[in-house]
């Protein structure tokens, strides 16, 4: 089965075609991503209206390029899949409406994919990973530990009770006058800094629950920087190094508890695995800390290639292909959802507002 996937949930416009054979093995036939970093850089973050307009301008030609790269015509794909949430509603509408139109025009089945499910299933595309396994999703909008039991069978073990880790990186970078996007900038500066200079907090460290928290760490960075004004270059590098070290310690503690729970629930699992996905997974220091953690706990550490860790359409096409193998297509009446938890049966997370829990 060959599936055309479309991703427009945030600030990347993407189209891809993925093939899944009868044995469940996958192959990427094309994968095209257009980033909007230049459009949003002057504002220091993603502007939803600008993102939606950029998707409108780029998506048609990206779909054409994905088809051309795969050597296919639209009628030769077997299904169309698109991200239906969670994400910025304007971008979701652009991608979803385009995918529906293509599916209708080519008379192909349509699958509305949860963006988080795309991340959750990527390791099955790249590594053929069997169920069950653990997923750590760390990005600008999400920080979650998810137990992946099967297609559509997910349990959120832990989530952030305040800020996503990617947001903490971006806010730290902005506070220190570093360029957008903030994550790579903080990582570069941290390489030159002294991680022991500032004693920053490790939120929730040692607690039994499996959730994450980063707002206190972000506040501590602000207070530290304020006390040092005007900041020298050495101050900035040392703050970045201390911040990154605090994050690595926090993740190791929080994730380690989830690894122990997994071993308790699945004592006979021959190859326990931790999958790390999301843009923050590109950080080499954090990856090294998590890889060492997995080694100590007897887990395989799996991080898909960087271009498949960040937002892309190959993961959406693959999730559509996985669902197509066992489920009926979705209706073309399905609406986008700015908030769409991967495990809707789970209890709401801490700190939910009037509009409900974040995905």
Curated annotation (Swiss-Prot):
Biological process annotations from GO: tRNA threonylcarbamoyladenosine modification
Gene3D superfamilies for this protein: 3.30.420.40
GO cellular component: cytoplasm
UniProt cofactor(s): Fe(2+)
Amino-acid positions noted as binding Fe cation in the UniProt annotation, renumbered to this chain: 115, 119, 311
Region (Disordered): 328-359
Presence of keyword Acyltransferase: yes
Residues that coordinate or bind substrate: 137-141, 170, 183, 283
A Pfam family hit: TsaD
Reactions catalysed according to its record: L-threonylcarbamoyladenylate + adenosine(37) in tRNA = N(6)-L-threonylcarbamoyladenosine(37) in tRNA + AMP + H(+)
Enzyme Commission number(s): 2.3.1.234
Main location: cytoplasm
SUPFAM superfamilies, per the entry: Actin-like ATPase domain
Free-text remark on how the cofactor is bound: Binds 1 Fe(2+) ion per subunit.
Function: Required for the formation of a threonylcarbamoyl group on adenosine at position 37 (t(6)A37) in tRNAs that read codons beginning with adenine. Is involved in the transfer of the threonylcarbamoyl moiety of threonylcarbamoyl-AMP (TC-AMP) to the N6 group of A37, together with TsaE and TsaB. TsaD likely plays a direct catalytic role in this reaction.
Family from the record: Belongs to the KAE1 / TsaD family.
PANTHER family with a match to the protein in the record: TRNA N6-ADENOSINE THREONYLCARBAMOYLTRANSFERASE, TRNA N6-ADENOSINE THREONYLCARBAMOYLTRANSFERASE, MITOCHONDRIAL
The protein, known as: tRNA N6-adenosine threonylcarbamoyltransferase
Organism: Brucella canis (strain ATCC 23365 / NCTC 10854 / RM-666)
